[in-house]
Amino acid sequence: MMEPSAYIPAYLERLYLESHPDLTDAARELLHRDVTANPGKYAQTEHAQALLSYQGVRDHLLDELDRIEDMPDDEFEQTRNRLFDEARDDLLKICRVDALAIDAQLLAVILADTPVDACLGDLMKLEEHARDYLVQSVPGFDLEAPHYWANAALVDGATAASLTVAEPVLVGWLHTLESISQLCLASARYRAGAAYARRALKAEGYPTRAAGTVLLALARLEDEDGFFELAHELEEATGPERLEDSPWYLLARAILLYKSNKMKPAKRALREFANRCEGGAFFLLNPTYLTPYLPTRPAPRDPWDLAHQAVWEAD
């Protein structure tokens, strides 16, 4: 996922540069540093202020979840549910002010205590809302372009990556795609999960491990050709060592071999997962609570976080 601390300053910097096109290179560098350090100073529009409000609500929620981590189970669950309810109330207030605060809407949906099908329905409505806005109102955005940006938008040094990070609605849309893909995977809608994850993977400059969702889905579908075709693409893009260290690839390969009734190779693949991934064996043997993704799969803070995420998603 892309942190608000990355895309909100990029958006604010873009707005400032659009209204001050004649800044020198030195002034642009100073602006970049100042916006990153003091984003509130540049949040002059309702949308910008809504984005910062969202960041504040989310940061507070994550800090509080860290604080209560060592509470006894009953007290933890009660406190967590209260925190979720309070955060959702705050997020809904933001959404009432700004219908384009996509991440705020997404997190509000995730925090709602609704059945899977109802949650998926809400996420799909949000995805359509964000997509319609991007197609109709964002110059240069193109669903059919290789990385969602038409060539006409890639001028004056702009890249697909720089345009993506500076468009909060696009970032929110990508987060929504990932959330849908993960919920589809968790509810055994494997083809849909893979399809939504691939759409998130298409973006450039957007940090994501959505390839793991696709690999797990293809393994569940016993799609051997599709699995190894994607593995080859990832190997070419990132290098063989990074693929071989991916908990999602190693675990999905074990699942695929097991479902294909190749028991000995499956056991070897599972041992490789346990040996190569820190915490892999522990999480396989000890199902451990994982804080819900808020709103999507977070960057790891500890070396074993990736193995924990992969096992949780594959369960």
Model-identified regions with their sequence ranges:
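Flexible helix-coil transition and linker loops at the boundaries of alpha-helical arrays
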Residues: 42-44, 91-98, 127-170, 200, ...
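Long, ordered, amphipathic alpha-helical scaffolds
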Residues: 49-55, 250-315
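Structural signature of alpha-solenoid helical repeat junctions
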Residues: 79, 83, 100, 165-172, ...
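Alpha-helical repeat scaffolds
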Residues: 38, 84-93, 118-130, 190-199, ...
